Amino acid sequence: GKMLFVKVPQAGELVNVDSAEVVHGLFQMEGEIDSAMIASLYMDEQSILPLVVEKGNIQIQIDNGRLTVSGTPLNDKLYDFVAQKNSLDDRAYEVERLESRMIMDGKSMEEVETEITREREKLSKEMDDLVKTFIQTNYENVLGPGIFLMLCNGFPYPLMTPLLEEIVDNAPDTFKNHDLIKEYLEAARANLERLN
């Protein structure tokens, strides 16, 4: 059987907090926790999904490329968000297919570009709104900072986008004073000063 590990960020690195062997497609972990925390489930050395380690019975389902975590309030919220994001990602993929179809159907490049740009901008705004609303709704629990930091980790180096600025500007102090967020914001501002 394969080994699964639950890892959480601590002092700048990922630390194993639990592990289990997968036997006949099933595994079980148990433990005590002081407060909810964002974690990643790893199979061997590969991260396969994010989850919230919190009090309750957490159900993890991995089948046919679909990963879901449910059974606790924050995981239900997280995976509702993931489902909405996946739906937008699917629509983005469809826009790329539409572009090819329009070209094959003999539409002018100008017509193709106008339509595709409009669709991409619409999707981009929907994605930004989804992320912003989710983080703002979850400022006060582990999901807001967790998703914000995942978003930040997607950049090659710390920087601030208009979306990140808006999220931070409206955030309560508890969010802004989160150690990792504070560190990111300081690094992003230092990078901005270096560029100016």
Give the predicted meaning of each segment.
Residues 1-128:
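A non-transmembrane, solvent-exposed segment enriched in polar/low-complexity residues
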Residues 129-135:
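A short, acidic, amphipathic alpha-helical segment used as a generic capping/interface helix at domain edges
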Residues 136-196:
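Charged, long alpha-helical assembly modules
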